[in-house]
Amino acid sequence: MSNYTATVYRETLETRVEVDLNLSGEGHFTAETGLPFLEHMLAQVARHGLLDLTVKASGDLHIDAHHTVEDIGITLGQALQQALGDKTGLQRYGYAYVPLDEALSRVVLDLSGRPSLHYRVNYPRARIGDFDVDLFQEFFQGLVNHAAMTLHIDNLHGRNAHHIAETIFKAFGRALRVAVEYDPRRKGQLASTKGML
């Protein structure tokens, strides 16, 4: 079983990102990214996933936020992969439905070792403030690829873009919290008949 913590630093010609993650945390979150709305969403993951998360990022925001958002997803995915270790004894699967007023989203995930993102979200507008909502999919794709998880994100209802985004990130945090729980009945076994994830 892993100690559920990881610190990952990633630097490219476009961005510098550092993520500090504790999956056995209390929901604490700090960030310096230059992207306040993304920070607001990541705070939801930390609070509802009961994980402690620090994200520091700088990037070519003078061009746009794409590289920075994607690389935060990549680095968080790498941190998740490290923190989970060999996944012995973990529940492996998690899901959550989260409402916020008129919005309702469902997130289902599998810490399978098989990166796959299924993202079905239609926002009623292209931006929330100055944040391009297309970048949420880029964030999750980067995360999925490097955490090696299967992730299904479905927005079932919603008219308000902020509400839609918030239900997605809250549901992701809650689903992750379930999947990373240690099950003592497994007695050190993986939740797989293959013997590996």
UniProtKB/Swiss-Prot annotation:
Its EC number is 4.2.1.19. PROSITE patterns: IGP_DEHYDRATASE_1 (PS00954), IGP_DEHYDRATASE_2 (PS00955). One of its GO terms (molecular function) is imidazoleglycerol-phosphate dehydratase activity. It comes from the Bacteria. Keywords: Amino-acid biosynthesis, Cytoplasm, Histidine biosynthesis, Lyase. One of its GO terms (biological process) is L-histidine biosynthetic process. The keyword 4Fe-4S does not apply. CDD domains: IGPD. Pfam families: IGPD. It catalyses: D-erythro-1-(imidazol-4-yl)glycerol 3-phosphate = 3-(imidazol-4-yl)-2-oxopropyl phosphate + H2O. The keyword Cytoplasm applies. It is found in: Cytoplasm. Pathway: Amino-acid biosynthesis; L-histidine biosynthesis; L-histidine from 5-phospho-alpha-D-ribose 1-diphosphate: step 6/9. One of its GO terms (cellular component) is cytoplasm. Its main location: cytoplasm. HAMAP family: HisB (MF_00076). Belongs to the imidazoleglycerol-phosphate dehydratase family. This is Imidazoleglycerol-phosphate dehydratase. The gene is hisB.
